[in-house]
């Protein structure tokens, strides 16, 4: 839904797409396209590169090598790498890439949501992990919009958290 959201902006945003799927074999080939993608970034100079890891619908997790190369390239053009981690808590491998734990920095932002792992589908409750100057800019913009989900969804989520803590069903996500 990101292209639709961008279209509602100031009209100057353009969306560039770069596929990491071999469409003939329907195979995930992000690592094989790392160099090509980095060259694409340098050529087109996007302000934001948005990745999803793991992605939907394949559940593929981008490799550390791929993401590190993209971040290094984005830094060269003074852009931002944003990773949407909507499905991060649904990765059950014992070893995950280091970038799953990166703190935000001047060029890296992570988007988070509890709507997938917290049985809150459709509630759009989430947060951003970003440098302070990004958070401050977002607060300026958000100060004139609705800042939270509607009351019904807040109450439902509150009940879910309370019940899940009491019955221990939330523990698996916190370990």
Place the predicted regions along the sequence by residue.
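A short helix->loop->beta-strand "cap" motif at the edges of active sites that frequently abuts
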Residues: 11, 76-80, 106
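Short amphipathic alpha-helical segments and helix-helix/interface helices
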Residues: 3, 37-38, 67-71, 99-101, ...
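Short beta-strand->loop structural element characteristic of the AMP-binding/adenylate-forming
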Residues: 13-25
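Active-site phosphate-binding strand-loop segment of PLP-dependent enzymes
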Residues: 22-93
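Alpha-helical elements of Rossmann-like donor-binding domains used by nucleotide-donor carbohydrate transfer enzymes
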Residues: 36, 69, 98, 125, ...
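Conserved core segment of the aminotransferase class I/II
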Residues: 7-8, 104-175
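A short acidic (Asp/Glu
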Residues: 3-5, 60-63, 91-96, 122, ...
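Substrate-binding/gating loop at the entrance of the active-site cleft, primarily
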Residues: 1-15
